[in-house]
Amino acid sequence: MADYKKSSVHCHSTMCDGKNTLQDMASAACAQGLTTLGFTGHSYTQRDREYCMSPSRTAQYKATIAKLKAEYKGKVDILCGIEWDILSEDKRTGYDYWIGSAHHLYGKNTGKYYEIDFRPQDLWDCINDDFDADPLSAVEAYFAEVEKVAALKPDILAHIDLIKKLNANGEFFDEESPRYKAAALKALQAAKDNDCLLEVNTGGVYRGYRKDFYPGAWLLGEWQKMGGKVIITSDSHDINSLTYGFDEAAAAIKAAGFTSVQVLTGNGFETQEL
């Protein structure tokens, strides 16, 4: 029977920006009683190679996971996925599943690509140099990128409101503003139009950036009204966060009015009643 507490399918390793090896992650998953572990290394993006897998490393990633699948057969279902970025040159085929995401904004004035969830100064530069010092214009551009990802119909749509990661205290923009909410809802509608599965991602809380998940409570509530489906993920970058905050995420999902979650297993997606 599907159990969200035993399936962690948004995970990174030292192949990209994670802290533990693929082997370490698999070993920890087994020790922690997981039945499904899905790796989702960051796809190669030539414009920002700091956090992603190179083409050669991607091949190594696939080969290593193939060995782990055999090693853990009957213990943990190991899945080979990819977190595919909208800027990626990689193919999305050849994986067990793929997560779609957006992490960057293009600056029309400078020609730069800015990573919006890493360095606060980069986000400030992006807003000031390329969005006429209007933070909400950058927000609107980000959610437009999410719409592009949704249109590709990923198996899972990642951290839909990641733009808020560095904004815990409202340093950059007002998350209650009509423009922010309108842009977010437009992206949410694109997700619904393309029958996307939305992750409730606990990673920002684990790493101390946020006190709320991706998506936040109000956006999650709107997704429930739309009849959308959700899956709980941790966006794990180390062995200690494989199922971090899963019970709290389930509680938030129930509070939003959902009665079930999707769980990815070795047999595909299954529904678990809450």
Language-model-detected regions and their locations in the chain:
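Extended substrate/RNA-proximal surfaces in nucleic-acid metabolism proteins
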Residues: 51, 55-193
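An N-terminally biased module of ancient metal coordination in phosphate/nucleic-acid-related enzymes
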Residues: 1-86, 164-178, 206, 231, ...
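Long, positively charged, glycine-interspersed low-complexity recognition regions
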Residues: 212, 216-274
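Conserved, mostly hydrophobic/aromatic
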Residues: 10, 29, 65, 98, ...
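Glycoside hydrolase catalytic-domain groove-lining segments
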Residues: 166-169, 174, 178, 185-197, ...
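Conserved residues at the C-terminal ends of beta-strands
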Residues: 40, 101, 160, 201, ...
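Structural preference for beta-strand elements that scaffold enzyme active sites
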Residues: 4-8, 36-38, 77-79, 94-99, ...
